[in-house]
Structures are given as C-alpha cells and as structure tokens.
C-alpha cells in the first residue's frame, strides 16, 4: 500500500528518501490511510447501546476501518499526510484484541520500503494493471505493477 501511496504522493516519498527518520510516521499513516484489514467481527458480551439501537449480548458485530477516516478525529482524513499530528489508528485493533504481530509488520514494512527507496528513489504505478486480491479478510494487491524511473 505504501508503494502506491508514494507513487501518488511523490513529494512525501522524496521527504522520506531525504529523511529516513520519517519511516515510523510513514508506515503508521499508510496503515491509517489504507488499512490492510478494513473490517473485523466481534461478539457482543453484554447488551450494547449504539446510536439508539440495542445490540443484544451474543450478537455478532462487524466493525469497519472507517474509524481511520473519522473527521472528528483527523483533520483532512481522506488526505495521505506523513506529517499528520495524530497518526494513531485502529488497523491493528485496540486493547486485548491488539495484533501481536504489529511491531513485526511495521518493521517488515520499514525494511522493505527502505530498500525500495535505496534502489529506486522514483517510481510510478501502472494503473491499468491494478487488481485487488479477492479475499474477504485482508486487503492487498493481487497485481500492482510498479514503473521504475
């Protein structure tokens, strides 16, 4: 997802190329902006009031990653901005359901993208070939062709 975001925001890609200390912010902003797991199901353990509707205990509830684009939480939520003031997100969950692999995923993303920038500081995307992977859980690319400069 970051490769595509950087192709669409080359100025921010250049900022990271020049200042690698921006990696942590970049990875988290990408996870906020393009969550890999846009929805998750949970069972309600007790009756829950949600917008004047009671969700009974035992019900399944589907939660969406739209929280990452909530305008009450983020200024310009539909804008990719690695210098955003508050880049917290719910892509890895929260509380007891927080992803155990979150730190490893961040590290893998940083290492892969760091190497990509080292080898090819400029690139674009072949938009005609884009194809999301057909899965019901994790969001990612089946095909994302990068055009190297």
Where do the model's predicted regions map?
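Cytochrome P450
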Residues: 1-149
């Amino acid at each position: 997802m970051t490769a595509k975001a950087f192709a669409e925001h080359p100025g921010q890609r250049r900022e990271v190329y020049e200042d690698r200390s921006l990696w942590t912010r970049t990875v988290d902003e990408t996870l906020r902006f393009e969550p890999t797991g846009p929805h998750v199901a949970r069972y309600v353990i007790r009756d829950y009031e949600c917008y004047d509707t009671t969700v009974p205990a035992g019900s399944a509830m589907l939660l969406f990653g739209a929280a990452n684009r909530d305008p009450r939480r983020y200024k310009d939520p539909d804008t990719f901005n690695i210098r955003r003031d508050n880049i917290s997100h719910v892509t890895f969950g929260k509380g007891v359901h927080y992803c155990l692999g979150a730190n490893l995923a961040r590290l893998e993303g940083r290492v892969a993208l760091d190497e990509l920038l080292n080898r090819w500081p400029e690139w674009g995307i072949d938009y005609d070939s884009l194809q999301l992977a057909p899965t019901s859980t994790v969001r990612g690319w089946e095909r994302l062709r990068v055009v190297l400069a």
